[in-house]
Amino acid sequence: MEDKEGLIWYNGDLIDWKDAKLHVLTHGLHYASSVFEGERSYSGRIFKLHEHTERLFFSASELDFDIPFSIEEIKEACYLTLEKNNLVDAYIRPIAWRGAETVGVSAQSTKIHCAIAVWEWPSYFSPDDRLK
């Protein structure tokens, strides 16, 4: 998926998919100081978006970091990213992680990053089955 066309919401800005990069010494990579959600949109509506976003923020608080955006900003960014990628049936992956400012178990001084990627993911069910 590295060379996919599209946009990713990255720290508040929409950037080209291929430009969404992080440093190899990112704390989130070495110490698993990251949180994510997996969401689905059907016909342009994100299923249980508020609940997923609240859980993302709760998970971050359990790892003792604050996502530098509000719940509402993340929800809006999810829809914006879908819209700018012209997707309606899609998978949405919001993720937040500690940066590479320091490597070591304690990372209170690291910057918190946030991104939202989306990609096409058709429904598993036919239109008739979805009505059951």
Residue locations for each model-derived region?
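Conserved alpha/beta cores of soluble small-molecule-handling proteins
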Residues: M1-K132
